[in-house]
A protein has these predicted regions:
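Structural helix-adjacent loops and short alpha-helical linkers that scaffold large soluble proteins
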Residues: 1-16, 26, 84-101, 143-157
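Short acidic alpha-helix initiation/capping motifs at coil-to-helix transition points
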Residues: 75, 98, 132-134
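Extended glycan-interaction surfaces of carbohydrate-active proteins
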Residues: 24-65, 102-171
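Alpha-helix N-cap/helix-initiation motif
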Residues: 8, 62, 66-69
Length: 171
């Protein structure tokens, strides 16, 4: 929607409410942590798009801070800042910008896996899941990237290498 008045009238309030729920917390232990990143899940639950559960067994447990959720969170904050600025809500724009900066710094500190030169899949406390999954592609494909061009290229290369291996093994 390019009509700012319609966005302000019909969407902006709802979007603000969604952000507020992520900040204060909602069901399934979904909440913003002190570092600005989103944490989600409890033991035995699957919440993200790739989690699988058979009976009581969570096949790909990803409780904690998921890479794609936090890439989407950062982009949501940047979009909210843009919309607020366009609507002359400068205080709100500044608040969203400040939180986005905090998220970006935390994302770099927490998710970048220096040894492997790609992004951790998920973080739960001190547990860093270094499984190479396509989820990290979200961090390089959204309108507001948090990584340098070199890091973005490396993420794409690592995911492609992994997919090529899987295709080769299965062919």
């Amino acid at each position: 929607a390019k009509d700012l008045k319609t966005i302000q009238k019909d969407l902006y309030g709802v979007l603000k409410e969604i952000v507020a729920y992520y900040e204060k917390g909602t069901r399934y232990n979904i909440h913003r942590e002190a570092d600005g990143l989103i944490y989600a899940g409890d033991d035995g639950m699957q919440l993200t798009w790739m989690d699988a559960k058979i009976g009581d067994w969570v096949v790909t447990p990803r409780k904690g801070k998921a890479v794609e959720i936090n890439a989407l969170w950062y982009n949501a904050l940047k979009i909210m800042s843009f919309l607020a600025r366009e609507m002359n809500l400068h205080g709100e724009s500044t608040r969203y910008d400040n939180l986005a900066r905090k998220v970006c710094k935390s994302f770099h500190d927490v998710f970048w896996y220096d040894e492997g030169q790609y992004l951790y899949d998920s973080i739960d406390g001190e547990i860093r899941n270094s499984a190479i999954r396509p989820n990290q592609i979200f961090a390089v494909s959204l309108p507001y990237p948090m990584l340098s061009k070199a890091q973005q290229r490396r993420v794409v290369d690592v995911v492609k290498e992994q997919l090529d291996k899987l295709l080769f093994v299965n062919s």
